Design a protein with these regions (language model features):
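Internal helix-turn-beta structural module
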Residues: 10, 39-158
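A glycine- and small/hydrophobic-rich beta-loop-beta segment
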Residues: 1-56
Length: 158
């Protein structure tokens, strides 16, 4: 279908772009409204701290909770579930359930966010609205490529 083809092309562009090592699909469920689902997913997917933890292979649920907290979405920390899975697997590795860290081995959590593609599953457990956002990690190569050069006036335009 056309949507699938467009999504795969967008992911290919991401994989080819400026030092990206991970493509992440954020699946947000259990929001009170579509607007909340969108706001929460965007907040996580656009968070510099979350993106850098992805690059480091760190399944840092604290940064995800932080990003959810400053989104415009209604979030009750004690209800949030967070899990990761390989994009080609339906097996979710939970790092947080009902706002509490799981006893999942750290190595298993790290394996779920290895380079390539993975899915991040966040359930706010408040309602029925869902959202999906595609994001990428933030690497030194990306920063170096985009930082500009104040000694080169040509870099000021882009």
């Amino acid at each position: 279908d056309l949507n699938h083809v467009c999504l795969e092309l967008a992911k290919m562009i991401g994989r080819d772009g400026e030092g990206i090592t991970r493509i992440v699909t954020v699946h947000l469920t259990g929001a009170n409204s579509n607007a909340d689902a969108d706001a929460a997913a965007r907040s996580v997917g656009n968070s510099t701290l979350v993106k850098t933890s992805w690059y480091g292979g760190d399944p840092n649920w604290g940064r995800i909770i932080d990003a959810l907290g400053y989104s415009d979405a209604t979030v009750v920390e004690e209800k949030v579930d967070i899990a990761s899975s390989a994009s080609d697997s339906h097996k979710k590795i939970f790092s947080l359930r009902q706002g509490r860290p799981t006893e999942t081995a750290f190595g298993s959590l790290c394996k779920a966010v290895e380079p390539g593609e993975f899915d991040l599953h966040i359930n706010l457990n408040l309602g029925k609205a869902t959202g999906v956002l595609h994001a990428a990690d933030l690497t030194e190569e990306y920063v170096d490529f985009n930082k500009g050069d104040i000694k080169d006036p040509a870099s000021l335009g882009g």
